[in-house]
Amino acid sequence: MSPARGDANASVARASGGSSNGAVTADEVVVQVDDSDENRENLRDRDRADKLEKLEKDAHARSQTQTQVQAPPVTVSSFRSANGDAIRAYRSETALTMKPRPRGSTSSTPTTTIPPLRPGRPSSPESPSLKRLSPRYSPTILASRTSRFSNRTGIRDSQSPSPILADEMVGRESLRKRPATSNTPAPKTPTPKNTEWTVDKIASALSVLAEEVPQNHSRLVNFLLEETEKRAPQPRHLSKTDPFAHMKSKAIDANRPRPEGVPTMDVKFKQHSGEYGKSRNSGRRFQYPVVCIKPDREPVPPYRFHHAEIRKNILALNSQLNFVPHLRDVDPNSAEEQKYSAWLMDLENLDSKSGFKIQPRSQKIAKRAQAEYAATLAPYLEPWLRKLNIEGCTKSNLIRFMASQPESDDSMTPQQKSNLLDTYSDDMGSPQAVRNASMFTEAWDRVFNDQSKLRRVALRDILMLDKNVEPIFDNKRAKDAPGSQKPPDEALMQKVIDALGSYTTLGCLICFSHDCEHGEIERDNQKRCFSLEEIGGLMPSLRRKWAAQIEQRQKTEGGSANAPPAHPPCRNECYRIHGTGDPNQQVPPWSENEVGTLEWMFATIGYSQTLRPECFVGAILGRPCWDVHRKLQELDLRLPPVEPRTIPKQKSLPWYDRRKKQLMSDWADATITHEHAVRELFAPCHHDGPCTAANGCPCASAGTHPVLCERFCLCTAEECPLKFTGCACHSSGKTCLQRQREGRPCICVQLNRECDPTLCKGCGARERADPENAYDEVLHSTGCQNVALQRGAAKAVVLGKSQLEACGYGLFAAEDIEEGEFVIEYTGELISHDEGVRREHRRGDVFDEENKVSYLFTLLEQEGIWVDAAIYGNLSRYINHATDGNIMPKIMYVNHEWRIKFTAIKDIKAGEELFFNYGDNFPNLTKKLVERNEQSGAETTPQQPKRANGAATQRATARKTTSKAKGEGIGFDDDDRDGNDSDPDDLWMGDQQQQQQQQQQQQQQQQQQQQQQQQQQQQQQQQQAQKPQPSTSHQPQSRAERSSTETGSEEISPDKQLRRENHDAQRQLLHQFQQQEQQQQQQQQQQQQQQTLPRKEPKKEELEEEIDLDAPRRSRLKRRLEALKGDSSSGGSANEQPPVKKPSRRGGARPGAGRKPKHRPPGAKGKDSKGKKGPSSSAGATTGAGSGESSGVNETGEEEVAVNGKSDSKDEAKEEETDKEKEEDEKVNEKDREKGRDSLSSPTEEPIAFLPVTKSAPSPAKKQASSPTKISDSNRTTSKNTSSNNNNNTNNNNNNNNNEFPSPVISPRKTRSSDHLTNSQPAALSPSATTRKRKASDLTSDTHLSAAGKGSDPSTMTTTTTTTTTTTSSSSSSSSSSSSSSSSSKAQPILEEKGDDDDENNEPITSPLKRQKTSSSLSSSHSMSVFSEAKEGVNGAVPGSGRNLRSSGVKVDSSGLNSTSLSQERGEKHEKHEKEKPKEKKGEKERERERDRSEEADEELLPMDRSMRKRQKPARYRDEGE
């Protein structure tokens, strides 16, 4: 056969298997090529019109007679297999052979056998899809469907043409190449005949074309299956026999009884069918015998969510419930199914409240099927339009027609409609095209949008999937319609804005990418990028840039803005050398895109001195520089005029200096920049003028407190006082820390942000924030230490089973971590709070609500932004909860994004589990769950031990809550470390020593509780459980032990005698449970009187009279006594333990109450106790009964004073009042007024602050002795020597369970009490401090001193300040023996004193350490001075100086047993003081003489009156100490 010429008779037939009706049953195609002379002759006659007309009629007649043939062969006019050309088929009805070739037949013509064109094509009759398109249609080649398991020789190779393409080519040729009429020769490319299309014809044609969709889908699936089978791996079985092939089912008939002793399992098989895949109820149940296996290994903890590891947070849109969560199979019409359905309704209601359109599940399934069907039909639209060849009916015209319909107005905005019409304005058709588009749309909806079909889709749904239509409905920037003629500069800027619109909208200002995770989700559930649109768009940024360039050029050159550039000419034939070049030189013409690039680059470069647009654009486009310069002159491009900037001078803020880069005092109260959780998010400011609230600056008017302007704001440091300019740290040594060796702390650290590599230039943050230097330890050993998150070098951590029972997994440290080091970042999806609530509810198990797992973390509470680490996150999601954790989360501001950083708060060894206190870090749902389980756990959980060595308490659990809660917090069982079931070989839980210590500790605590219950029969258990102490701490002694220790002592110290006398005077006011110990005090009192001088014993009536005097200044005290009596009487029934007197903010049962604060102006009136300010506020009168006696520091830093017993009534005290004492009181007041002693203390004095420490130096008792300490009347004490024992004995006497806090310690520096927020710390008061501060508080208090018995150090003493109506007898009478032993194990309480330089006379500060040296010159023991001062406090003498020794008349030697006249001691001190008089200052002499004059009236003054005088410490004590 000649491949170049001739129209050979080629017939395509199938090798039949002997079918009578000519059906095709063969698996191969046979092509017969007829190259005979007769055929050639027929080709010559083809051009004759009469011959063709006759042949056409004959062919038409034959086609009607052979309609029964299923697969007729097709004649191929030419077949070129040698060169691989495509098949070309010419319709020749004369050569058409309709007979199938029988099996085994022969022919004289050569026959060529080829494989089928398309494997797997089903055997079917001629496709009517193409036959109905034209009456002159000829059948195309139809290949038979090969079996998937047939011979591989019939599979098409990759080089063979696609059968779909071949069909389409044959169809096109058949439609296009029609025979010419008999009078005219046939043209080479005949013009198709125009068809008058109607809606019915189009619908019929679309119905035929629709049949291709399932056929092509089946071909595609078959092809994919066969290709997969070819690439399937070979089986690698060890044996060719299948051991399970002959295995029979061991199912037991459910109707038969179960065999005894054989465990079985019920299995139900369900078949899902019907609409939407619902299961049938006719499932059969089978029973299978099973063998229960218990492995020797511990099972791996289960978890529900497998996370995808991410390094940074990612944005997540609000998502609707797309599928129904499957928890487990439930029986139909059961209670579980109803509960499950109700839960699904709750999920849908949450979506509805969030703004989503809720549809029934059936509609959702139908809509999903509709979307899938639309995606399937979308690729067929354009090919079908080309086949139908309808005039003007193109896809563009269909989109324009869709946009112009009235029903489209409801689904699109006018702007979107305008954008659609403008986008497809280039292909505007004729009116006939519009009519055809309307007919095609109607026909499409008739065929594919039938309401009776499950899968239906409208033409609009197909067109909306177009790649040009979808972005228009995605909030794309609208293009301005062409308007009137604009000036050249405005027209240029409009072109630049249009050209750079995508960069302006999508370009991120942080990472400079166009698809990143920076930005936020708007309310319409659309992402808003952090781009130039956030700061006003492109034009404001360009204008500011031009203005800055002009100012810089004027400063450097002093010329105009059009001055020549300073940089040298470029090497690309620069225009500065060649000008506009040779005009005769041929250059390529400029395209439209090149001109646009030149325009927007010209505007972007602006007035730069270092870069010219000619040189830059020439390098980009590959053109000579002079060519670009010539084009610029042709275009005559000019920038719009720029107004010069006027920078007004702005003063620095009082709390922030942008030039010094530091924060001033009280900055935390002036701004909320550092409080990320409560601040609001504002777009960077881009206004004109200064950044002030009056000018509308969002940064300056951010609520009541401004925030600093960030580097993305368009303001500058010259004009904005709020502009953040980075830190001023240097790069030598380790810098950017909270506490630095030199200079102020880093401002970035203070503001809870990491150093900005752009702004912080001195500390080296740029090099250390580079990820390439993340593991360069040498570089990070110096310089900035505040770029941990930007560095991204987390500590090595591993995942393992948590130490908390039923908690699943936990995170463990794989290396040693020092305190303050960065551990890991908490990453996840950034979601809104509404989305977080829905996700939390979806993940819950409706059948097991207690087992909920939460991975939500509150990032910005004010803005409602959470971090969800359930699906996307890192290993930090496994960190569990503990009250005392070893790491702490912190929200940091890092380059305009907020991130969560975990830092170690203590040293962590490798292998320790990481914990942190969830607290308020987790959102509402988790928080409520935690609180609920805490309440349930507190009610049902016994006391849990605390881990030894100060480790974190494991009673709190992780975020993974469970119904097995038995502990506090969220509630789980005790840690295995606290039990007896821990494995000693376990790496994480083998700690036998700690377990033994905890067991011993539990036994000791139980014994102590039993002893306390026996001694305190009327006392019930306290409301709060006793908190455990480490095994190394000292356990308080019980009352029985202290009583036995004191009664067994052979000798009584003088200071104990004073306490007995004081208790005897108040014996009738004590609680009932203290009466037994009062009898022991009376016996010891007789022995004490033999060793001490006789003294007047205060009577009960006198003490009551001091409380209930009718003077106006005691009115506040009366109200407090009444409140105290009411509280004690009401709370006594429930808990008979004496109430604890709780101090108010400015008053209460504490020394120095009622004094003016420092910030209070003189003459300012205090407020009464009815909820107002004042020294006797009833708010701090008492605490709840049963809370235990305690002594410490309240929330304002002032001392809490322990109060025992009950107060007597006001009337009873008045009845016992005597006239003689009234007269004495009036005389004393008269003397005070004469001597000017009624003045209050200086309002500049401040109360005492306590500093907690962990341990104290075990110094000997004699070294601790010091001179009597001076007590200021402004709520300060300076007792150092007795503070440790005071604290121990106060706790032992008042609250045996209150040993959880460390003892307060003296700090020699000045400290405000408000600087320390230590709550409920024991207060240690010296005798002089107790008496003096008691007088200042309108509450007549007595001083109880506790001294050691025989064998005890007399320097270890305790004072407990209590009111007369609520004092303790025996509880504070026998604590010296325990205090001496506890002083070595517990911290020495040392009180902090504010120096006298803050007082009126500005005396220098006296260190408590210096006062210790004074004891050697005053007395030989510390107990002497304390005893003398305490005695003076009870009898009326003013303590605080050496004159108390003279008035008391008692001297005690170093052993505390021998006594002499105190007047002699006073005389010795006076003589020594006279020798040192030249050293004293004038002010000190005057104050000393005033104190000497006041000593005569000290015995007569009431404690309340004495408290109103200011007492200064004699200077001689300081001189002697120095």
From Swiss-Prot:
SMART domains the record matches: SET
Description of activity control: The end product of PRC2 catalysis, H3K27me3, interacts with EED to stimulate the enzymatic activity of PRC2 allosterically. The enzymatic activity of PRC2 is regulated in a very complex manner and PCR2 can adopt different stages including the autoinhibited (A); SAM-bound autoinhibited (A'), basal (B), and H3K27me3-stimulated (S) stages. Actictivity is inhibited by pyridone inhibitors such as GSK126.
Disordered: annotated span: 1-196, 406-426, 933-1522
Keywords (A to Z) from UniProt: Chromatin regulator, Metal-binding, Methyltransferase, Nucleus, Repeat, Repressor, S-adenosyl-L-methionine, Transcription, Transcription regulation, Transferase, Zinc
Gene3D superfamilies: SET domain
GO molecular-function terms, A-Z: chromatin binding; histone H3K27 methyltransferase activity; metal ion binding
Binding positions for Zn(2+) 8 per the UniProt entry: 736, 755, 763, 784
Residue numbers spanned by region MCSS domain: 481-560
Region (SANT2L domain): 561-650
Annotated CXC domain residues: 658-780
Residues where S-adenosyl-L-methionine binds: 809, 852, 854-855, 880-881, 926
Keyword hit for Aminoacyl-tRNA synthetase: no
Chain residues that bind Zn(2+) 3: 685, 687, 691, 697
Region annotated SAL domain, chain positions: 301-320
Record-listed Zn(2+) 5 binding positions: 691, 709, 715, 720
InterPro entries: CXC_dom, EZH1/2-like, Ezh2_CXC_fung, EZH2_MCSS_fung, EZH2_N, SET_dom, SET_dom_sf
Effect of residue 325 to S: Impairs allosteric activation by H3K27me3
Ranges where the record places region EBD domain: 221-250
Biological function: Catalytic subunit of the of the Polycomb Repressive Complex 2 (PRC2), a histone H3 lysine methyltransferase responsible for generating mono-, di-, and tri-methylation on Lys27 (H3K27me1, H3K27me2 and H3K27me3). The tri-methylated form is known to be critical in gene repression, and its proper placement is essential in defining repression patterns during development. The PRC2 complex interacts with thousands of RNA species in vivo, but the physiological function of RNA binding has still to be determined.
Domain notes: Ten structurally and functionally discrete domains are dispersed across the entire active complex and compose an extended structural scaffold to accommodate juxtaposed EED and SUZ12. The N terminus forms an intramolecular interaction with the SANT1-like (SANT1L) domain and is referred to as the SANT1L-binding domain (SBD). The EED-binding domain (EBD) is found next to the SBD in the current structure, where the EBD similarly occupies a surface groove across the bottom face of the EED WD40 domain.
Name under which the protein is recorded: Histone-lysine N-methyltransferase EZH2
Organism expressing this protein natively: Chaetomium thermophilum (strain DSM 1495 / CBS 144.50 / IMI 039719)
Lineage, broadest ranks: Eukaryota, Fungi, Dikarya, Ascomycota, Pezizomycotina
